[in-house]
Amino acid sequence: MKKKERKITHKMDFGVTDEQAGAAMDALNKILEDRGQSTGAIILGGRDLSDDQITPLVINDTLHKITGRWYYVGDTKTKAWKDPSAWHAAYWYFVADYLKERFGKDWCLSSEQSLLFNAADGRIPRQLAIRTPQADTHVVDLPWGYELLVVHSDLPEKVEYERRFGLRLYPLETAILAVSPGFYQMNPMEARTCLGLLPGRKGIAEAAIAGGYHIGAGRLVGGLISVGNELLAEAILSSLRNSCFDVNVCDPFLGSVKIGPDSCAIATRIRLMWMRMRPAVISEMPDDFLRTSWSPSKVKERMDDVFQDDAAASLAMEGYDVKENLIRAVAGGEWEYGTLCKEAEETDVAVTIGYHEAFRQVQTDILDSMTGGRGPEHLHHRILDWHERLMKPLEQHGLNDGEIPHDYRQCEGFIRGSEHIPVWWINVPFAMMALSGLLIQEDNAFVRAVLGLFFIDYIRPVRTGSGLFARLYMNSQLLAGGYPWTVIPANEARAFEESLEKARVTGEISDLARKIAWHSLNSFVAPKLNGEDPEQD
């Protein structure tokens, strides 16, 4: 099969000739190819493309203005004015490129923004504060209601360069010393995560003395004690007092949470989020009397019966246009690839075949866990095997776009329409390791179902199918807890995604847990509920 074309193409109009359109598109595709960048691309007029090249691309909705002569490349599958996904993907690349172009190296994020970024906070700030001595204080308006607050201010003595996007940040220890007490109380998860990242005492003590951070040092030491790192706290305090540096220790938090040190911010963040979310999930659990004990034969029967509905709903949630007759043909096993491709888009055909194979592997793994294999709490270890099954047809027919089956993603992974920026791909293994430890230790299957779904989606361990695997894992744990295999119907998909987005951005998991509980209950007694969502009561 011919490999699917992946370059950006659009039909041109508004009086732009085909020659102008083609030349502009070729120039843009060459830039993207040279950068190895398919998402998040930033274009500066006059530097990257000429005005004659930019004009047709703007007219044709390929480039979208940010400010001045800066543009981002739109998502070719959606309309930019309806979906901010492409802007979210481009945001941090723009910030780094724009500020470098204006100020060279004379800028950095504010101390608070530096800590939020270091803490693996995936949210895009509505207003980003940066410091520079090269400009007066002013605000730069950005798309979708975002702002860049440029503050005229000196820079810290040392500025650190961040590799993922090219940002310039406060050094970690200086940022913690410099932030106001309100940061600890408004952003306790991020503050605790950064305290867990702190290096040895020498650099911290030196930064405190050099900057004269008497009050900040007291908060830092008190914060370390609060998170359970008394050893480092005492060492820093001893170094400061030996240097005759006055410090009054105070706990900047409203309560203590013991986390211990960790060199990976996302690992600490996941553990803190789990601790915060778990009680909320338990409060939304369905009543125990609704649970049943599934036999292996009943699990197989249920999964066989539900596959077509599950595939239609789950693939649609991932943006695929898969028809019932295609799913029915694949599930029936009597099909020919070329024939299916005459009736549907090839990518939809391949992904349906792949999902069927992944679903069957999930079924095998669940039955194995019920008949003497490793317990269901270990099923998250099988995600890469499920990924391999999903990707095999795509790889066979040249549709995998370079993605490696049975491996964590090797590139950025963005979520359509979300303000959450998933884990940097380099840190995905560490994030999954932290999640694994939490899932294995958790004895409540409903908690594993909800938080497993959430964190797999939050991390996005693979480029293609993370949402699919999150829901497959959720259902594996629902079965383990005595709940039925649960399908999120098409008419509820948007509300379900909104609850998931709320959890990603705000950390509030209750709505998501409530919807999973309700859909699970509805799978038991659908005729009695008449499809009424409790959110509508």
Annotate each PLM feature.
Residues M1-I66, T78-D537:
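FIC/Doc superfamily catalytic core
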Residues R69-D75:
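Minor-groove-contacting beta-hairpin "wing" of winged helix-turn-helix DNA-binding domains
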